[in-house]
Amino acid sequence: KLAMCLVNLSRLKKGDVLLDPFCGTGGFLIEGGFMGLKLIGSDIDDDMVNGTLLNLKSYNLTEHIISIKKWNAGDIKSFLKQLNVKYVDGIVTDPPYGISTSAKGNIEEIFNNLGDVLKKDGYLVFASSRKINLDLELMEMYELYIHKSLTRYIHVYKKTDN
């Protein structure tokens, strides 16, 4: 349910390109595939990448895949360059809690770099355990109470310039 909600918040339409740079087992990519989106995903963990591919196959969504690959989200530009993709239409992701140990750079730096590969008027939608301020325009933020020691913040940022 949360995956569908976040993908819907990205305002993508059929045929658009969705990027999830922390794809895990592919929940956002699966929802994107159901919506007819083209899918690009990466994760730093081989097992997660393999799980994403298996899950997309089990839902018969492999025809939507542009690329799913092991890659560090802190260097997403070079990943997209290999695909001859300069910009994506939208980004939906949920970085791991231990982000500082699993991706180079801090989370703000990584997300601002993601903004560089986002098309003008595209949306970056993500969940995190704290409020995160970026160079993009914050359109919406939602607090999702999980339990007494965990609240998730759903951020919806828009790229308003190139």
From Swiss-Prot:
One of its GO terms (cellular component) is cytoplasm. Its EC number is 2.1.1.213. Keywords: Cytoplasm, Methyltransferase, RNA-binding, S-adenosyl-L-methionine, Transferase, tRNA processing, tRNA-binding. Its main location: cytoplasm. Pfam families: UPF0020. It is found in: Cytoplasm. Catalyzes the adenosylmethionine-dependent methylation of the exocyclic amino group (N(2)) of guanosine at position 10 of various tRNAs. Acts via a two-step process that leads to the formation of either N(2)-monomethyl (m(2)G) or N(2)-dimethylguanosine (m(2)(2)G). This is Probable tRNA (guanine(10)-N2)-dimethyltransferase. It comes from Methanothermococcus thermolithotrophicus.
